[in-house]
Each structure stands twice: as structure tokens, then as C-alpha cells.
Amino acid sequence: MILRKTANGRNEPMNFKLFPVPMSKRSSKWIDGLRPEMPVSRAARKTLRRRLRPVGRWLADAADRAEASPEFVHQLRVSTRRAMAALEGYAELVPVRKYEKMTKLLGRIRKCAGTARDCDVFFDRLTESNDAEHWRPLAKRILELRAEAQEPIEKLHRKLRGGKFDHKVKKLVKKLQTPEHEQETTFVEWARHGLARNVSMFFEAGAADLGDVTLLHQFRIEGKHLRYALEYFSAAFGPEVRNELHAEVERAQTLLGIVNDHASAIEHLTTWRAEWEEPELHALLDERLATEQAALRDAKQEFHRWWTPQRATELRKRFASILELPDEEHAA
């Protein structure tokens, strides 16, 4: 369950049931209906509509129906990330002020959703373990934090309800422009250029010392950017992009996501250890810290067993071949 803060400031349990969100309601990761030779401005309009509109819908669900499923806030964070990535992918076509305002708004939504989602993930890990009863005092405190995290989500929704977010999306899409020197640019040309940049940054980050958690996190970020770019640019290329390249990058993201979950938990636990005063919670936090640190080591080892220099080299060559990118530009 989640605690909702009442008007008198008290936390009261919400009827939190883990009902799955129907797949039909979830936004597709792919942007269908695009053709390689279509003008990039048309591709941009369709892509940004498809990426931005779901944010408003998930925000409403995360605000009004959080007690029904943690999936709503999860989908809000995912849709916001995808929207920000698509906006960045077509940034040169968006008027500067529109771009800055929408990016700022999406950043606020993502931050709110991220805080709430972190609580949900950590709470689930505590309560789904075999010794859930042992962690109950800590889980209860996490629920209180989750209640606090719900308030900014609801506040943003109140500000944007009544079609206000959709109106912002329509205004932004309507203002999309193609600079004169880009008038003849096709979707595939734009996509190839954009992906070349993402691929380069991904492998550059992958060539760093990935034994360092900070550098490993940066590699994860670049991998996420590349994965989202593959999703909104995939229609410009053959099926190999969806079926092969995206699958490889997604696998890397899955393994790095596990690493990040444990690293994030350690960061939160350390902060709570410094802020909370209850001895009982201190003991649980110390115990959990040791557990998360061991799990982080295991997760890093699992990633490094999979992400080998040979795999990186082979993947780079496949990108160069399928996307017709010059291989030397992406050498580690």
C-alpha cells in the first residue's frame, strides 16, 4: 500500500493493489507510420506527438490512480524519458523557447516520477523478500517517503489538468520549423546523422574504466540515449535495427539497470542513515547497506562477464554496417 497525506497532515493507507496495466494502454516504444524518404519535419511532428501526449495521460493516472498500481508512476517516468529523448533528437527543428520550456517541464515531471518510483522499487524489494517481516519498520518509513513523493505528482497534475498539457504539445508541434539549409533533408538522412552521434557517445563511454561506478553510470546514460534513439529512428532503417541492435543495447541496459538499482539504494540508505535518528532503523539500514553493497559487486561482475571487449567490437561493427556508418568514427 501507499500512504496518502490527508488534509490534516496525517498519513493514511491507500488501497494499493498490484493490478497490472493492460498492454493496450502502454505506449509503444516504436514510432510506426514513418518512411525513410519522407521530409524530416513530418517525421518530427508525428514522433513528438506520439512521444509527448502519453506523458499527460500517465501523469493523470499517476496522480489519481496511484493506489491501483505502481505501474502508473513507472510508465510516467518511462514516457517522460522517451519524450525528452525524442525532443532532443529533433531539437534543431524546435524553436528555442519552446524547446527550453518543454524540456524544463518534462524534467520536473521526470524528477517527481523518479522519486516516487525509487520508493516503490525499494519498498517492493523489502516486502517481497523471505524476511519481509524483519524489514517492516524500514518498509513503513519508505511508505511515508512514498506518500511525500506523491504530493508533487498531484500538484503538477492539478496545474496541467483540463487539457493544458496537450495544448502545450500542440503549440510546440505546430511551431516546428525546418531551417532553409535543411529543407530537403529526409528522415533517413536525419536519423543516420542523429544515430551516428549517439553511437559515437555510447562507445566512447564504453571505452572508459567501467570498474568505476561513476563511469559505469555514465555508460548506462549513453546507452539509454542510444536505445531511445533507436526506437524513434528505427523506421528509417531495416528490421535489423529493431530485432538485433536494439535487443543488444536493451540487454546492456537491463544489466546496468540492476547495477544502478543497487547503487541508488546504497546512496539512499547512506543519506537516510545520516538523517534518521531511531536506533532500530540505524541497525536495519546498516544491515541493508551491507546487503546492497554485496549485491552491487555481484551485479557489476555479471555485467562485465557479458560486456566484453569482443562483444563491444562486434556490436560497433554491426552498427556501422546496418546503419551505413563509417566504422572508424566509432572506434573505442
PLM feature spans:
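Function-determining surface determinants
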Residues: 5, 11-332
